[in-house]
Amino acid sequence: MKFDKQGNIQETHKEYSAAVWEVSKQYNIPVIDLDKMSRDLLQKFGKENSKLLFMQLDSLQHPNYPAGQKDNTHFNEYGARRMAQIVLMEIKNLKPELAERIIIAPVKKS
């Protein structure tokens, strides 16, 4: 996650996203634009609060990371659940016939 000096989330996957949309159009495949939707979520959280979604651990907070962890790439459980919720909601929007098969579990707040 990268924010600019004004606190706006940066788009860091432009070329990849463009390629995804190109293939989507070429083969008529629906796309869940998780790049944009995750940026929207991060922007709503803001620079400091968005850290709650990532592997940001203080020293001795987790036995696997005794020195702590400052990872702004990989989601923690809460962040992964938020991303999964976005995907599931978009599946419902793109493929309504699948909606009855999707169960949205509440996000754990720890």
Predicted regions, residues:
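Catalytic His-Asp segment of secreted/periplasmic serine-dependent ester chemistry enzymes
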Residues: 1-110
